[in-house]
Amino acid sequence: MPRMSETLAIELGLARVSEAPFIARMSRDYIEHGLAWRWQTAQIRGLIQDKESVALCARTQALRQQDPVSATPYRDGDVLGFGIMTYGLETAHLMLLAVLPRARRRNIASNLLDWLEETAITAGVSRIELEVRAGNTGARSFYRDRGYHERDYLAGYYSGQESAFRMARNLRKS
């Protein structure tokens, strides 16, 4: 009997404190790999609870399958990606953004960033800044395609081990 394809729906919602350990592991594995682990569970939990931050998750919604025998790699409510942004009076800072490798190329990162940017606009923020590894050409390209520009080169930014670019996007029209 042939296996039918799955239908996967994604919903965005605020991160739950109970998800902090998983988000921290995602940060370690997909953002901080090769560096000292900075964004551990306690730090993520703090950002989730911080009134000046938004921690957003992309989760799977109810999965519909035509063939009940088919194995699926996702369960309802699985976290597939997350983004965390802090908000100041004029500037927001994208702290972390990651999507599980098996869930990439589904516009999850774009949807997370759209939501966080809209929240920044609603809050009256005029600019978003972020840092990205200098060697992460895929992420740098993603952000450039989204209207961010490389503002500063930060030599040794990551614990003296790796350099970064500070990128920024102006939200107000000139």
Q: What residues fall within each predicted segment?
A:
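C-terminal "cap" of GNAT-fold acetyltransferases
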Residues: R3-L8, A55-C57, S126-E129, R133-R140, ...
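Conserved glycine-rich acetyl-CoA-binding loop
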Residues: L100-D114, I121-A123, R127, R133-S141, ...
